[in-house]
């Protein structure tokens, strides 16, 4: 542990505090003329960049150690005066003078003495940084010598002018502080004198004066063991006479060549000096070693040039020194175990530094962090108020003031007042206020101003104070404290002759009403007149004189006015927002225009409405004569200015800033959340210095607009990644620069930047056989395809609330009070950051579970002509149908007609003989009627035509007997008409079936739209929950929590210091409570979203990747397949399944047991044992129990495949006879495996696409219009039940004519002859006429009968 830093350092020792006073002895004055100086700034600037030395905070350079405090082995943030990180400072160089062999010539300096710099908050100096190296001698830049350390000299003062008669700048007027090194760098002078220029040749008061220059001559002044302690001081005295010196201090310095730091600051205690010398240990920490009694504000400083008079052959190079301005900054400091500051971070330098300071850690792990600790600072003022006539205070200044019980009241509106002028006419003895400060009362705007005045002795001032219970407040005047009010007690001076002095002061001692029960005292209401005013107006001439009217009685007391008249003024104001406001007389000022302050944070005072905000031009809304436009939370959002323009007003809030940091490459980038890049530049006052610089200079790639906000330090890319270490949200990922993939900036190529990639999450579609479980008494008998839609919220919007900004809105007074609440804000930030990390973890787990390596689109995985749009109810038929072969289709003509169900039997009958003769024989019976198809082939046409013509032609020859030949024709007509009728009836029944099926589809569509409505409602609620929470949090900003106003600026403007703290503390306490409740709610919602993410993971794994056996888990009904798509804040599922449309109520049993001993029991597998009462009787008890699956009612015998032996259970059904053993059969419950086999074959699907989630902000998601459309669709579907009219089909084949058959047979014969000659005759001999027989090679094979196989 280090000792107190106030202990004087061994290497920098104070050796004298010479006599302080108005005439400190500074020794003899300078004599002779000044040395001539050659001023050549170009020589010094040419080596300006030789040794760039920026502030390196990692080495704690330029850090002033906290005064009076000591820390050990700790890291903390500290606000004080520090240099800015990476500040290059300003470089200064000294040089040897001109010389020739054997003589020393004029001095060689830069123009530093004419450069007057602003002192501001002070500065620090880096001294001897390049000592012991090799450098140029400046005067001869080609000559390089070892570099020696040299100390700077300074002039510091309040006022600066020009030297006369040379008219050169840089002369310090009045008292000037001089810091002067001497004794060849072994002593430091500090004195405070008036510098009077001497008029000798080349001196400051002479015409040829060029530059103030210090010098010493090492050959004579720096002789070993005998250093000249006043060589430089003597040179300074040659230029100035030192007059009226108030002090002179000397400090010795140990001679060395080590680099060191020196600093100067000033406060009300004086000028403070700091040095990094500490017990001969040289570090970058500077410790306070002296305070100089300089109380006049130092505004400027100048570096005094120095030139060393060295011989030509002994020139040296002198180390440059660097001056860095100090600023009020917050640093993160690391103290080692000894107490020294080993490293630091400038919290305002860049976003990474901001991140480190937010977490008070130098080591930050790779991640995405939300930080925002820099608020908008007002950069101007905007004031507008009514300019009308002056408020008339004449009635108060003329006539005789009334007594207290009959006070007079003046109410002012729509005028400008001047309370300062009014009160200056009186001798004020007391000015006390409530809810407003005296200064604010004189400078604020109000909707009305009320003044009550009366004659009143100041000796009785205590009786008017709050809490008094005397006769004054009971029966005369009671001040109203419900509004801001002030009480002024004053004496009327003799020269104010317009006011007439009364002879007596008077007040009431009682006021009461007489009744049978005695006196009923009547007390004054606040700000109201006494009920006995009518009696008191009669006046009082003696003490305790009473007046009564029979009902009321009052008593008065008088005492004479001695000396000057004394009066009381009660001033009350009311705050409002109307244009008839009362404002102070406006002084001439330049802050009445907003045009030059648009889009920046300003303090505003608009007709009594004060605050802080950003103004910008926008489209006018609201009523112009109302001036102000407010939102639902009573926040000012618009203003109609006196210049005719309308301005939108938004608060000076900080933009959510996220820092993306990669530890491996030590790179970082910045993301401005929920803000457009076009708006970022208007908010730059809130950002770190490097961020503002980059935004202006565009030195980094970007800004780049993304769905999550405006990104800096990124370049866009087409990369798609499966793993992401730095998720940005909305499926975006930050890819840090790496050794394998580096992206150089296009501008300089010297820095690595991040890339924005897209996360790729995919999931395969793997389906398993359907198998339902569970027990129900209503078993489905019919199904339809149905789609159930479901939304699951997996994440909520990440929120980072800048606690300090939310509570205090940038007001330092509030922030100082907020520090007394300890680490509350840091805990809030940590809690929100933890919630965000919890979300990242849950989403990462979800995505890691559902992603796959290789996927293919759904359409690419389907074989054949399968069409996804044709997913509908499978067609179920009750019979089998035979089809002709392809050859038959080629050999026969065919026609398609409506088939009532008899066409197949007719066709089979016709094949057994000549068709022309079998037509009537093959007539079919349907419902008792003979029917024939309504078609004739050419043979039947010829036969029936011949029969008809013959009967007609022969009728005249046979006396009508030949008409019997027309009977077949008539019967064929009758039968065919019957067929047409039967066909129409069957078609009508088919139409009913089709209509029923279509109406079932409509019902399924209605159900689908209903679930869509419900799912959309859940999406809307999930997205809007975040906005509602933020809106509620924002609404609390308008809550006063018992304070006089919700605006801190109003509180600061109205009240004095003590009341300000009390009122602001109420706001802090209330807002912290609201913020704590919000954070607690956010944590609960985060945990709920994490649990929902787990549910979504289960849904994807069980529903999307496979088939679920759980009833109702993956939609309604028997699950088939599910699809997942992206949705705001979650996943949207489409569950496809078989949904029952009708059920049968069956008597079921959990199991069956017999009465044998030991008893045997069986239980169903994935189904039930049911009583099939339609096919069984009570007597047939062996056959009345059947098995049916739970997903479809299909009673079947109990087999080993659908049952198993189990132990006895009380719920099992007992049979009185022997339990039949399960049949040895493979029959199982009816499932849909065969129907869906082709659908499930080679099916795969691309998983959820998480790349295009739209940005969700606090704007409420409104799906009401879409939901109304869906409701209207459902309504229209309810009206869509129609009767369909569509016919069935039957294909009828007709043989070709005889001549076609003749040609066909001739062709076959020719083909057979060719085959015979090729295969037989050519293979058995030399020719078909040879001696060898061909029967051996052409022998036929033995015939055998083929066993017939029947296929059912």
UniProtKB/Swiss-Prot annotation:
Positions of region (Fusion peptide 2): 904-926
UniProt keyword Signal, yes or no: yes
Coiled-coil regions listed: 1020-1064, 1259-1287
Major localisation: virion
Membrane topology: Single-pass type I membrane protein
Annotated site residue numbers, Cleavage: 745-746, 884-885
Glycosylation sites (chain numbering): 29, 73, 111, 132, 167, 174, 244, 250, 418, 495, 590, 617, 716, 760, 771, 782, 867, 1145, 1172, 1214, 1226, 1242, 1257, 1278, 1289
Membrane side Cytoplasmic: residue ranges: 1319-1352
Region (Heptad repeat 2) location: 1247-1286
Signal peptide: 1-12
Segments in the Extracellular topological domain: 13-1297
Transmembrane annotation, as ranges: 1298-1318
Disulfides per UniProt: 193-245, 347-357, 391-415, 433-486, 445-583, 909-922
Ranges where the BetaCoV S1-NTD domain occurs: 22-359
A single BP term in Gene Ontology: fusion of virus membrane with host plasma membrane
Localisation per UniProt entry: Virion membrane; Host endoplasmic reticulum-Golgi intermediate compartment membrane; Host cell membrane
Start and end residues of each BetaCoV S1-CTD domain: 389-585
Gene3D superfamilies, sorted: 1.20.5.300, 2.20.210.30, 3.30.70.1840, Spike glycoprotein, N-terminal domain (2.60.120.960)
Stretches the record annotates as Fusion peptide 1: 885-906
Region spans: Heptad repeat 1: 991-1041
Subunit and partners: Homotrimer; each monomer consists of a S1 and a S2 subunit. The resulting peplomers protrude from the virus surface as spikes.
Domain notes: Fusion peptide 1 (FP1) and fusion peptide 2 (FP2) function cooperatively and have a membrane-ordering effect on lipid headgroups and shallow hydrophobic regions of target bilayers. They are considered as two domains of an extended, bipartite FP. The membrane-ordering activity is calcium-dependent and also dependent on correct folding, which is maintained by an internal disulfide bond in FP2.
UniProt record similarity statement: Belongs to the betacoronaviruses spike protein family.
Name of the molecule in the record: Spike glycoprotein
UniProt organism field: Bat coronavirus HKU5
Name of the coding gene: S
């Amino acid at each position: 542990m280090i000792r107190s830093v106030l202990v004087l350092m061994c290497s920098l020792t104070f050796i004298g505090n010479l006599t302080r006073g108005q005439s400190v002895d500074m020794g003899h004055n300078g004599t002779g003329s000044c040395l001539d100086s050659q001023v050549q700034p170009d020589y010094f600037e040419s080596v300006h960049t030789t040794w760039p030395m920026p502030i390196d905070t990692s080495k704690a350079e330029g850090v002033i150690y906290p005064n009076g405090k000591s820390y050990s082995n700790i890291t903390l943030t500290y606000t004080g005066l520090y240099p800015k990180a990476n500040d290059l400072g300003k470089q200064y160089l000294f040089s040897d003078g001109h010389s020739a062999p054997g003589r020393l010539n004029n001095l060689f300096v830069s123009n530093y003495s004419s450069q007057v710099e602003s002192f501001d908050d002070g500065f620090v100096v880096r001294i001897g940084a390049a000592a012991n190296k090799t450098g140029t001698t400046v005067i001869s830049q080609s000559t390089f010598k070892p570099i020696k350390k040299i100390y700077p000299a300074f002039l510091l003062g309040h006022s600066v002018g020009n030297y006369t008669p040379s008219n050169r700048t840089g002369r310090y007027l009045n008292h000037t502080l001089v810091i002067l090194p001497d004794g060849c760098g072994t002593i430091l002078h500090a004195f405070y004198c008036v510098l009077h220029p001497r008029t000798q040749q080349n001196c400051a008061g002479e015409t040829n004066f060029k530059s103030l220059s210090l010098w010493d001559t090492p050959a004579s002044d720096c002789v070993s063991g005998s250093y000249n302690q006043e060589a430089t001081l003597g040179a300074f005295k040659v230029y100035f006479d030192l007059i009226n010196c108030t002090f002179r201090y000397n400090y010795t310095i140990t001679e060395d060549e080590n680099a060191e730091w020196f600093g100067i600051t000033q406060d009300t205690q004086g000028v403070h000096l700091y040095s990094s010398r500490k017990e001969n240990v040289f570090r970058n920490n500077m410790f306070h070693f002296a305070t100089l009694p300089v109380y006049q504000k130092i505004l400027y400083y100048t570096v005094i040039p120095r030139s060393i008079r060295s011989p030509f052959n002994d020139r040296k190079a002198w180390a440059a020194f660097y001056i860095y301005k100090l600023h009020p900054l917050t640093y993160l400091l690391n103290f080692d175990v000894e107490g020294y500051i080993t490293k630091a971070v400038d919290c305002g330098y860049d976003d990474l530094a901001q991140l480190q300071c937010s977490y008070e850690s130098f080591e930050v792990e790779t991640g995405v962090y939300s930080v925002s600790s820099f608020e908008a600072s007002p950069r101007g003022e905007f004031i507008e108020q009514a300019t009308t006539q002056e408020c008339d205070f004449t009635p108060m200044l003329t006539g005789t003031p009334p007594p207290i019980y009959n006070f007079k009241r003046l109410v002012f509106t729509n005028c400008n007042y001047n309370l300062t002028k009014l009160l200056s006419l009186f001798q004020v003895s007391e000015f006390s206020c409530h809810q407003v400060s005296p200064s604010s009362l004189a400078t604020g705007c109000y909707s009305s101003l009320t003044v009550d005045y009366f004659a009143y002795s100041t000796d009785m001032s205590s009786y008017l104070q709050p809490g008094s219970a005397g006769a004054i407040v009971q029966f005369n005047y009671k001040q109203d404290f419900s509004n801001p009010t002030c009480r002024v007690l004053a004496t009327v001076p003799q020269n104010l002759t317009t006011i007439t002095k009364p002879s007596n002061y008077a007040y009431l001692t009682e006021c009461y009403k007489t009744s049978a029960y005695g006196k009923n005292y009547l007390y004054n209401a606040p700000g109201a007149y006494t009920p006995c005013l009518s009696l008191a107006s009669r006046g009082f001439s003696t003490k305790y004189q009473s007046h009564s009217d029979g009902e009321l009685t009052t008593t008065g007391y008088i005492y004479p006015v001695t000396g000057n008249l004394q009066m009381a003024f009660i001033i009350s104001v009311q705050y409002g927002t109307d244009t008839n406001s009362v404002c102070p007389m406006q002084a001439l000022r330049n802050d009445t225009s907003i045009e030059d302050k648009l889009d920046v944070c300003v303090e505003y005072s608009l007709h009594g409405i004060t605050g802080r905000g950003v103004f910008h031009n926008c489209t006018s809304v609201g009523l112009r004569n109302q001036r102000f436009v407010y939102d639902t939370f009573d926040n000012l959002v618009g203003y109609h200015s006196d210049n005719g323009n309308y301005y939108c007003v938004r608060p000076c809030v900080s933009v959510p800033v996220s820092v993306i940091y990669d530890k491996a490459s030590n790179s970082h980038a910045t993301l401005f959340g929920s803000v457009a890049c076009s708006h970022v530049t208007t908010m730059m006052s809130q950002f770190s210095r490097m961020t503002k610089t980059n935004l202006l200079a565009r030195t980094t790639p970007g800004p780049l607009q993304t769905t999550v906000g405006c990104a800096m330090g990124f370049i866009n890319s087409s990369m798609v990644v499966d793993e992401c270490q730095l998720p940005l949200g909305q499926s975006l990922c930050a890819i840090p620069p790496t050794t394998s993939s580096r992206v150089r900036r296009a501008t300089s190529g010297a820095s690595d930047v991040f890339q924005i990639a897209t996360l790729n999450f995919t999931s395969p579609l793997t389906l398993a056989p359907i198998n339902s479980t569970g027990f129900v008494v209503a078993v489905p008998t019919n199904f339809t395809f149905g789609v159930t839609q479901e939304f699951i919220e997996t994440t909520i919007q990440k929120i980072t609330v800048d606690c300090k900004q939310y509570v205090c809105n940038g007001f330092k007074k509030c922030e100082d009070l907020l520090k007394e609440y300890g680490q509350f804000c840091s805990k809030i930030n940590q809690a929100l950051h933890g919630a965000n990390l919890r979300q990242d973890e849950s989403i990462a787990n979800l995505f890691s579970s559902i992603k796959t390596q290789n996927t293919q689109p759904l359409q690419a995985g389907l074989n054949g002509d399968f069409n996804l749009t044709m997913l509908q109810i499978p067609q179920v038929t009750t019979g089998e149908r035979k089809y002709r072969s392809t050859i038959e289709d080629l050999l026969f003509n065919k026609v398609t007609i409506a088939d009532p169900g008899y066409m197949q039997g007719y066709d089979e009958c016709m094949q057994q003989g000549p068709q022309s003769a079998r037509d009537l024989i093959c007539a079919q019976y349907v419902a008792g009627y003979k029917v024939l198809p309504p078609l004739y082939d050419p043979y039947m046409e010829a036969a029936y035509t011949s029969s008809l013509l013959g009967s007609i032609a022969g009728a005249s020859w046979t006396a009508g007997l030949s008409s019997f030949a027309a009977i077949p024709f008539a019967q064929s007509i009758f039968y065919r008409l019957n067929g047409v009728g039967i066909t129409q009836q069957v078609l009508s029944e088919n139409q009913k079936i089709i209509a029923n099926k279509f109406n079932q589809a409509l019902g399924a569509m209605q159900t689908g739209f209903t679930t869509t409505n419900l799912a959309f409602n859940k999406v809307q609620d999930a997205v809007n929950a975040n906005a509602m929470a933020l809106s509620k949090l924002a609404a609390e900003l308008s809550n006063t929590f018992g304070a006089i106003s919700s605006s801190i600026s109003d509180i600061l403007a109205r009240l004095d210091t003590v009341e300000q703290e009390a009122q602001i503390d109420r706001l802090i306490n209330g807002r912290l409570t609201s913020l704590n409740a919000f954070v607690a709610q956010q944590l609960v919602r985060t945990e709920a979203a994490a649990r929902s993410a787990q549910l979504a993971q289960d849904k994807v794994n069980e529903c999307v990747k496979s088939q679920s056996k759980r009833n109702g888990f993956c939609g309604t009904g028997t699950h088939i397949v599910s699809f997942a798509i992206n949705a705001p804040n979650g996943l949207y599922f489409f569950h496809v399944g078989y949904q029952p449309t009708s059920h049968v109520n069956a008597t079921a049993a959990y199991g069956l047991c017999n009465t044998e001993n030991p008893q045997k029991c069986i239980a169903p597998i994935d189904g039930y044992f049911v009583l099939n009462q339609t096919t069984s009787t009570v007597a047939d008890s062996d056959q009345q129990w059947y098995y049916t699956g739970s997903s479809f009612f299909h009673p079947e015998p109990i087999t080993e495949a659908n049952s198993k032996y189990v132990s006895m259970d009380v719920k099992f059904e007992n049979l009185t006879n022997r339990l039949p053993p399960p049949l040895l059969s493979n029959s199982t419950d009816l499932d849909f495996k065969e129907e869906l086999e082709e659908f499930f074959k080679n099916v795969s699907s691309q998983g959820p696409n998480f790349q295009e989630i739209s940005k969700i902000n606090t704007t409420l998601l409104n799906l009401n219009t879409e939901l109304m459309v869906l409701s209207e669709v459902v309504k229209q579907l309810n009206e869509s039940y129609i009767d369909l009219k569509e016919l069935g089909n039957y294909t009828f084949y007709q043989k070709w004519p005889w001549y076609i058959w003749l040609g066909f047979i001739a062709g076959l014969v020719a083909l057979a002859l060719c085959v015979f000659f090729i295969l037989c005759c050519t293979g058995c001999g030399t020719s078909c006429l040879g001696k060898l027989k061909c029967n051996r090679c052409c022998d036929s094979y033995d015939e055998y009968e083929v066993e017939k196989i029947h296929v059912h």
